[in-house]
């Protein structure tokens, strides 16, 4: 495996002692590791046996390429990934108020997300290409320190006891992890079918139900979920 990283940035001194930077950052990963199950029943086998009774069709071992064996994991190095981001950074390190602030707008895509994932179709890497599990589209982080003005001009014991105090904090906001609804089937984890309707749940219910489950149903055995 190897990766290629590149970036282009512009830095500038701004008014009020603020330093600013805006950058494009990219990364390409090639020959990444994955461990697909090469003995998983293919969709072609499922389609070819669609006319069989359900009891026979649900016996996944009878549909495996290598009969008599369960999962066979093969380590391959044929996966790819790419990352593209706009990064904005600002810092002020002088005066009573100092801070550093950064914002990242990014997207990370790959056809694998760890060499042990259980992909729905290990024979079709293009179908598995999409956002990785650690993808966060928006990340905002700021750290700040404010030097309290109380007793700043005092001297001696009064200043040592009550002066020189600072208030500081760290704030971070980021978008959540993307979610792909899946379900367990006879051939492993499968994507669900989107049947329409609003996915997001508004109001207080969103803390109990993260998304509208009625918008998804199990996909048929003979094709991939949407």
Task: For each feature predicted by the language model, list its residue ranges.
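Short, solvent-exposed micro-motifs at the edges of structured domains
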Residues: 1-226
